Every structure is written in structure tokens, then in C-alpha cells.
């Protein structure tokens, strides 16, 4: 869900990509009732070439990642909460994962959004959210792409960067409830966790 992409370059900075999250025909989003607006900008993305392929990484110099603490482990019934993101509705999270099975990224409690990572697949299911347009989407991943994960979430937009920027998935995500905090649940080992709050 990204449209109207535009890039800018400056000799003193990386080439940046900006875009609108949402599609032109989707003007019935919940934000029209609560705030009188639809669609929003994605995070700026720094573009580079690696092996002839465009790589996109979040360009957020004002929101640097810092080491974060897991409370619990993903295999626990409640999963592993990211302590630094408790109560946050706008954040940045990065981690490395090795998979024995699926790992669910849970944003808030009972939010309706399902983000599931596996060694060769990403599943994003919006059917339980306040704006289920797009339904359930499955993306086949190249080997190793799911081992490095970075997620940006800002209230009604979620951006998932995999493989250190080789794959990017963007969706509008109007969640149920408060939609605060994040936990990791499932059969995966998670290391090198870092995070930053934007609220």
C-alpha cells in the first residue's frame, strides 16, 4: 500500500524515497471520521544498490535505535515484551531471529493485526482490524531475509523491513483498542534487539 513515490538526492545525503501509504481508491479509512484525513507519508527510505538490487532502509537520524530489553522469551505463553516500548503507539524495533517455527509480532492487545514471520514467509493479516482492506497477504521470502527484521509502527501505519532492506512491506493498520506496546510470540530465538520510541 504505497503510492506516489518520489525520490530526492543530494550530494551531502543519501538518495531518499518518500511515498504515500494507502491507495487512491481507499478513501473510506477510519481517520476520515476521527480527523478528517486519509493516507499518510511513509518513513523516508535511504536507497542503495546491492548486487544490482535496490535496498531500502529507514532514514530516521532523529530516531536512533538503542539496545532494548526483552521481558520473557518468545516461547513463553505471553511471549517476550519489549520493555522500552510499553505503552507506546509509535515506535521503531529491530532484531535478529532464527526460526524453529512461526514468530508472531503482536502490536497491542487484541488489536486485530497479525504479523507472522517464518524462515521463508511473511504473513500480514488485517481482517481483524478496523480497516480490513487488503485482507490477508502472504509474501514468499528469500533464504535469510527473515533473519534481520526492522519494524516501524506509527499508530495507523506499519512498515516491515526484512533482509536489511531487501524487502519492504507497508500497510495502513487501524488497530482495535489502544494498540500500544509490542511483544514477540512463537518458536524463534530473538537476539540483538534494539528499539526507539517516537511518542
Give the ranges of each region predicted by the language model:
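Beta-rich accessory regions
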Residues: 1-199
Amino acid at each position: 500500500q504505497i503510492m506516489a513515490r518520489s525520490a530526492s538526492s543530494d550530494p551531502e545525503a543519501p538518495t531518499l524515497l518518500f511515498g504515500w501509504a494507502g491507495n487512491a481508491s481507499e478513501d473510506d479509512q477510519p481517520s476520515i471520521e476521527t480527523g478528517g484525513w486519509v493516507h499518510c507519508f511513509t518513513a523516508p527510505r535511504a536507497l542503495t544498490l546491492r548486487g544490482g538490487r535496490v535496498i531500502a532502509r529507514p532514514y530516521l537520524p532523529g530516531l536512533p535505535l538503542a539496545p532494548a530489553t526483552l521481558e520473557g522469551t518468545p516461547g513463553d505463553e505471553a511471549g517476550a515484551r519489549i520493555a522500552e516500548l510499553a505503552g507506546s503507539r509509535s515506535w521503531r524495533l529491530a532484531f535478529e531471529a532464527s526460526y524453529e517455527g512461526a514468530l508472531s509480532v503482536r502490536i497491542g492487545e487484541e488489536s486485530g493485526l497479525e504479523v507472522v514471520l517464518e524462515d521463508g514467509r511473511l504473513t500480514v493479516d488485517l481482517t481483524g482490524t478496523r480497516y480490513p482492506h487488503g485482507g490477508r497477504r502472504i509474501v514468499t521470502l528469500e533464504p535469510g531475509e527473515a533473519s534481520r527484521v526492522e519494524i516501524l509502527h506509527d499508530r495507523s501505519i506499519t512498515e516491515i523491513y526484512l533482509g536489511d532492506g531487501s524487502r519492504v512491506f507497508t500497510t495502513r493498520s487501524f488497530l482495535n483498542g489502544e494498540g500500544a506496546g509490542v511483544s514477540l510470540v512463537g518458536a524463534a530465538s530473538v537476539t540483538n534487539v534494539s528499539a526507539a520510541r517516537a511518542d
